[in-house]
Amino acid sequence: MDLPGPIHEILVLFGGFVLLLGGLGVVLLTNPTFSAFSLGLVLVCISLFYILLNSYFVAVAQLLIYVGAINVLIIFAVMFVNGSEWSKDKNFWTIGDGFTSLVCITIPFSLMTTIPDTSWYGILWTTRSNQIVEQGLINNVQQIGIHLATDFYLPFELISIILLVSLIGAITMARQ
C-alpha cells in the first residue's frame, strides 16, 4: 500500500497493539471460545500487516485459509467441549504453565538474536521473478507460482508451518 509515512506508521502501531492484545487474549482467557475468537483477531491483524507490505496475495490467503477455515475449525472443535470442564479447574498456575511461559518467552528472544545473523541469500536461489516476467511467455497462474517460489518463499513457508500447527491443534482439541 502506498500510504503517507505517518498513516503507515499509525496503521503498523495499531495493528501491532491489537495483535499483542489478541495474543494475550488467546493465552490468558480461560474460556476457550473467547480464546478462539482472539485467535481470529490475531490472524486478521497478521493479514493487515501483509497488506501494508504490499503482499496482497498472501494477505488474501491468510484470510481465507486461517480466518475462514482454521479458526472456524477451532471454534467448531471448542463448541464440542463440555463447558463445565473449564469452570471446574480453579488451579490458575501450574508447573506446566510455568514451563510453557518460559518456552514462549525464550523462543522470540532466540529468534530475535538468530534472524539478524542469518544470511538469507541462500533462500533466493532462483532467478528473480521480475526477470522471468519480462520474458512475457507465462500466464497469470505461472506468475503466481513464480512469485511464491521467489518473492514470497519465506512467508509461504511460514504460513504452511502455521497451518500444520493449527491443524494438529484442532485435531488434538477435537479428540479431547
UniProtKB/Swiss-Prot annotation:
<keyword id="KW-1133">Transmembrane helix</keyword>
<feature type="transmembrane region" description="Helical">
    <location>
        <begin position="92"/>
        <end position="112"/>
    </location>
</feature>
<dbReference type="InterPro" id="IPR042106">
    <property type="entry name" value="Nuo/plastoQ_OxRdtase_6_NuoJ"/>
</dbReference>
<feature type="transmembrane region" description="Helical">
    <location>
        <begin position="60"/>
        <end position="80"/>
    </location>
</feature>
<dbReference type="GO" id="GO:0009535">
    <property type="term" value="C:chloroplast thylakoid membrane"/>
</dbReference>
<keyword id="KW-0618">Plastoquinone</keyword>
<keyword id="KW-0874">Quinone</keyword>
<keyword id="KW-0150">Chloroplast</keyword>
<protein>
    <recommendedName>
        <fullName>NAD(P)H-quinone oxidoreductase subunit 6, chloroplastic</fullName>
        <ecNumber>7.1.1.-</ecNumber>
    </recommendedName>
</protein>
<feature type="transmembrane region" description="Helical">
    <location>
        <begin position="33"/>
        <end position="53"/>
    </location>
</feature>
<comment type="subunit">
    <text>NDH is composed of at least 16 different subunits, 5 of which are encoded in the nucleus.</text>
</comment>
<keyword id="KW-0813">Transport</keyword>
<keyword id="KW-0812">Transmembrane</keyword>
<comment type="function">
    <text>NDH shuttles electrons from NAD(P)H:plastoquinone, via FMN and iron-sulfur (Fe-S) centers, to quinones in the photosynthetic chain and possibly in a chloroplast respiratory chain. The immediate electron acceptor for the enzyme in this species is believed to be plastoquinone. Couples the redox reaction to proton translocation, and thus conserves the redox energy in a proton gradient.</text>
</comment>
<feature type="transmembrane region" description="Helical">
    <location>
        <begin position="152"/>
        <end position="172"/>
    </location>
</feature>
<dbReference type="GO" id="GO:0008137">
    <property type="term" value="F:NADH dehydrogenase (ubiquinone) activity"/>
</dbReference>
<dbReference type="Pfam" id="PF00499">
    <property type="entry name" value="Oxidored_q3"/>
</dbReference>
<dbReference type="InterPro" id="IPR050290">
    <property type="entry name" value="NAD(P)H-Q_Oxidoreduct_6"/>
</dbReference>
<keyword id="KW-0521">NADP</keyword>
<dbReference type="InterPro" id="IPR001457">
    <property type="entry name" value="NADH_UbQ/plastoQ_OxRdtase_su6"/>
</dbReference>
<keyword id="KW-1278">Translocase</keyword>
<comment type="similarity">
    <text>Belongs to the complex I subunit 6 family.</text>
</comment>
<keyword id="KW-0472">Membrane</keyword>
<keyword id="KW-0793">Thylakoid</keyword>
<dbReference type="GO" id="GO:0048038">
    <property type="term" value="F:quinone binding"/>
</dbReference>
<keyword id="KW-0934">Plastid</keyword>
<keyword id="KW-0520">NAD</keyword>
<feature type="transmembrane region" description="Helical">
    <location>
        <begin position="10"/>
        <end position="30"/>
    </location>
</feature>
<dbReference type="GO" id="GO:0009536">
    <property type="term" value="C:plastid"/>
</dbReference>
